[in-house]
Amino acid sequence: MQQNIIKVIVGSKNPVKINAAANAMALLFPEYEIQTQGMDAPSGVPAQPMTDSDTRQGAINRVHYCQQQIEADYYFAMEGGVDCFEFGPATFAYIAIAHQARLSIGRGALLPLPMQVYQALEAGEELGHVMDRLFNTVNIKQKGGAIGLLTRGHATRESNYTQAIILAMAPFLNPELYP
């Protein structure tokens, strides 16, 4: 008996994002074989989005690009960004998921950022590079991310993405409630 397959395209080749998509889908659809593939997808926003709206738009742009390139059951994009809120600077990620003609948008948890990190980002640096310098790491954005470093490993970029994906999947899990 052949197992049913769900094909997922992730708008990034970053292993953290690909693993988060695979993990979330495996939790949501344990009876299916999940085939997850990453692909380079342009965000159409700055490499380090500095606003909530740019971050959200980057995720949407990546999903739309993937939909135009290859056939799949689901398309995922995760875009990390920063913004300065009334409580201070924070980093977060938007999740865009497309399935058939429907698009769902979700957002991961907010991680407060030290002001010195935010100031470096305002000066044009990317968060991963700033964190690598501050914590003497290499390519942290493809590992635990700023989340892993600032929480001392109690949460990671991947765990945040996985939870955000699960939440953003709600309209697909309950389509009758989301007309």
From Swiss-Prot:
It is an enzyme of class 3 (hydrolase). Mg(2+) binds at E71. Its EC number is 3.6.1.73. It comes from the Bacteria. Its cofactor is Mg(2+); Mn(2+). It catalyses: XTP + H2O = XDP + phosphate + H(+); ITP + H2O = IDP + phosphate + H(+). InterPro entries: ITPase-like_fam, Non_canon_purine_NTPase, NTPase/PRRC1, YjjX_NTPase. Substrate binds at E71, A72. GO terms for biological process: nucleotide metabolic process; thiamine metabolic process. PANTHER family: NON-CANONICAL PURINE NTP PHOSPHATASE_PRRC1 DOMAIN-CONTAINING PROTEIN (PTHR34699:SF2), PTHR34699. Belongs to the YjjX NTPase family. Homodimer. This is Inosine/xanthosine triphosphatase. It comes from Shewanella sp. (strain MR-4).
